[in-house]
Swiss-Prot record:
Gene Ontology, cellular component aspect: cytosol; glycine cleavage complex
Subunit structure: The glycine cleavage system is composed of four proteins: P, T, L and H.
Keywords, sorted A to Z: Lipoyl
CDD domains assigned: GCS_H
Gene behind the chain: gcvH
Domain (Lipoyl-binding): residue spans on this chain: 23-105
One matching Pfam family: GCV_H
InterPro entries with a match to the protein in the record: Biotin_lipoyl, GCV_H, GCV_H/Fam206, GCV_H_sub, Single_hybrid_motif
Function: The glycine cleavage system catalyzes the degradation of glycine. The H protein shuttles the methylamine group of glycine from the P protein to the T protein.
This protein's name: Glycine cleavage system H protein
BP-aspect Gene Ontology terms: glycine decarboxylation via glycine cleavage system
Cofactor binding mode and count: Binds 1 lipoyl cofactor covalently.
Cofactor(s) essential for the protein: (R)-lipoate
Length: 128
């Protein structure tokens, strides 16, 4: 069973967001990484790029599939996880810690209300 931390918010496209001081750390869920299998490559957005919620921001590739990454929130990309360039498997091993993808300076914290809670995300997974 996939881990779904209660303190995070989730997009229906399987990204998660954790907000601290107006900055959202974004990654893909344990469920998503498990479905993808062992990741071999992660393409991330550019620092300084401005994104809207739902914008495609990168790609994760495994030995069996490639999947687009979408930003669950709007704002400016302020940091990317450069460790993933050499160690994409961090997304598999620690998706909610060292496997985060990028950080976004939020332009509208109210968007978080449109994301799923852990219980809502679990219900979505169960219905897939």
């Amino acid at each position: 069973m996939s881990e779904i931390p209660a303190e995070l918010r989730y997009a229906s496209s399987h990204e998660w967001a954790k907000v601290e001081d107006g900055v959202a750390t974004v990654g893909i869920s344990d469920h998503a990484q498990d479905a993808m299998g062992d990741l071999v490559y992660v393409e991330l957005p550019e620092v300084g790029q401005v994104v809207a919620a739902g914008d495609e921001t990168g790609v994760v590739e495994s030995v069996k599939a490639a999947s687009d990454i979408y930003s669950p929130v709007s704002g400016e990309i302020v940091e990317i996880n450069e460790a993933l360039e050499d160690e994409p498997e961090l997304v598999n091993n620690v998706p909610y810690e060292g496997g985060w993808l990028f950080k976004v300076q939020l332009t509208d914290e109210g968007e978080l209300d449109s994301l799923l809670t852990a219980d809502q995300y679990q219900a979505q997974i169960d219905s897939e």
